[in-house]
Each structure stands twice: as C-alpha cells, then as structure tokens.
C-alpha cells in the first residue's frame, strides 16, 4: 500500500530455487482477477543454475492500483509464479457511472458518494441521511442540482436531517475531468468554493459541489434523457405523465 498521493512504489523481490534458477520474468497482471498479461520489457533474465536472485522493481507514474506477476523457472522446468498487488492510497475517490433522476421513479434523486456512488429513493434514503451529499429535482421545468436541505423550498419531496450543499458550474471539460487522477486532488482543491443552493444542469458539463461538512468534489454529467412517469409530489399525491430527467453521472471527490 502506497502513502496517500504517492505515485511510485519499489518492490523488493527475492527468489530462491533449490534446483537452480533458469529464467526470471515479470509480467503485467489484471488488478481485479490477477490474470497474467504481457511480459514487461526488460525484465526477462536467464541464469546458469544460481539458486538465489534479488531485484528491485520500480513502478512509477501510478494513477491506479498495479498488479504484477513474478515468474521463475528452475533448471528442471518447474514454473513458480506469484502476484504482487500494489494498492495506491488515493487523494481522489472515483465513483462508478450511475443513473440518478430529477424525480423518484426508478433509481431515485438522492446521491451519496460513498461505496463508489449510491443513488437512493426517498423510500429507502432515510436510513442513509448522513451519507447523502446532493440531490436532483425539477425547478420551474429545469433539471437541477439541489441542496438536499433546501428541497422543501422548491416544493419537492424530502425528509428530515438532510445536509446543506452548494454548487457551481466549472470551466472544466469532460476530457479535463477524465484526466484528473486518483493521486492528485489539486485540480479540485484549488477551485473556489461554490455558493449556489441549486443550479440548472446540462449534459457534458462538470459541476463543483461542497457539503456543509466539508466534502468537496466534482460531478460530471454524461447524458440526460427526458422521461415521463407517475411521480409523487411533496404533498403525497401521485401525478401521471409527469416529466422528469434521467441523468448519467460520475463523481470525483477529495479523499
């Protein structure tokens, strides 16, 4: 495990073979499955029956976890392989791609950055009040990011205890957002804190948010689709053919 924000790691590898070492190689490996990948250039070495070998393998420019497979072949042709997984300690937490709605229909309109990004309906969100960071809704027909604590001001369904959150549109492009790595929070931390309790949203834009408890991050709007459904109002009535938006987002949050 690397130090927080570190983008390099040196693995100290020591191998022994009673029958003598013939070949030593290091391969890339899949960080999730551990499956063996391509041979890393310059790591293949052959020996004349020596029984021990030590190498320091330097990994630099790390922006995500890194897995390697060390392969040793002895003089009798026996191959022994072991994986080494280097886990970075991120400065920025990435979410998965999720669907969120401007009204509670199928996915929900409340978002929490924990657990790689979670979306909740009002019906199941009350048990996660401390985790909910922002919400979405329709304000005067405009799909918007809305401070969870301010939903009642816009006549939107809500529940008690939700936190206050501020928003701002950034000048970042989606490409610039995608280029923010897990080991460098500076592109987020240096942005001026947001001040708006709600803001209309558009596809392919990047928004800044900061919660009352200090969590600061970015929201990238990948796509927006207009839909209709039977939607509950703030007074508990259900209205057919109500227009709302289904929005695809990811978030990147300072750890």
Residue ranges and their predicted role:
Residues 176-236, 254:
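Acidic, glycine-rich flexible loop segments
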Residues 1-4:
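Short, compositionally biased P/S/T/A/G/V-rich stretches that sit at domain boundaries
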Residues 7-13:
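Structural beta-strand segments of beta-rich domains
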Residues 9, 22, 64-68, 217:
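Exposed beta-strand face motif in extracellular beta-rich ectodomains
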Residues 49-51, 58-65:
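Surface-exposed, short loops/turns at beta-strand junctions within beta-sandwich domains
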Residues 240-255:
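Short, low-complexity, Pro/Ser/Thr/Gly-rich segments in the mature regions of secreted, periplasmic
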Residues 75-195, 255:
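N-terminal "domain-start" segment
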Residues 13-38:
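Solvent-exposed loop/turn segments flanking beta-strands in beta-repeat/beta-sandwich domains
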């Amino acid at each position: 495990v690397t130090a927080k924000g570190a983008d390099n790691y040196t693995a100290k590898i020591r191998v022994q073979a009673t029958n003598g070492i013939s070949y030593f190689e290091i391969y890339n490996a899949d960080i999730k499955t551990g499956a063996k990948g391509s041979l890393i250039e310059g790591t293949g070495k052959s020996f004349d029956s020596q029984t021990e070998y030590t190498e320091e393998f330097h990994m630099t420019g790390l922006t995500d976890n890194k897995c390697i497979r060390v392969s040793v072949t002895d003089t009798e042709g026996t191959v022994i392989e072991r994986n080494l997984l280097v886990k970075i300690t991120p400065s920025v937490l990435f979410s998965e791609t999720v669907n969120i709605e401007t009204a509670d229909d199928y996915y929900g309109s409340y978002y929490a950055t924990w657990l790689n990004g979670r979306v909740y309906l009002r019906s199941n969100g009350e048990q996660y009040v401390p985790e909910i960071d922002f919400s979405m809704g329709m304000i005067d027909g405009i799909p918007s990011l809305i401070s969870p604590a301010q939903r009642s001001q816009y006549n939107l369904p809500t529940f008690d205890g939700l936190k206050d959150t501020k928003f701002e549109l950034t000048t970042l492009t989606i490409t610039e957002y995608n280029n923010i790595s897990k080991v460098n929070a500076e592109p987020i931390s240096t942005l001026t804190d947001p001040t708006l309790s709600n803001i209309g949203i558009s596809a392919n834009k990047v928004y800044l948010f900061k919660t009352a408890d200090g969590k600061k991050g970015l929201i990238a709007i990948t796509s927006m689709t207009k839909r209709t459904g039977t939607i509950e109002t703030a007074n508990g009535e259900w209205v057919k053919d109500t227009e709302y938006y289904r929005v695809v987002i990811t978030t990147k949050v300072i750890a």
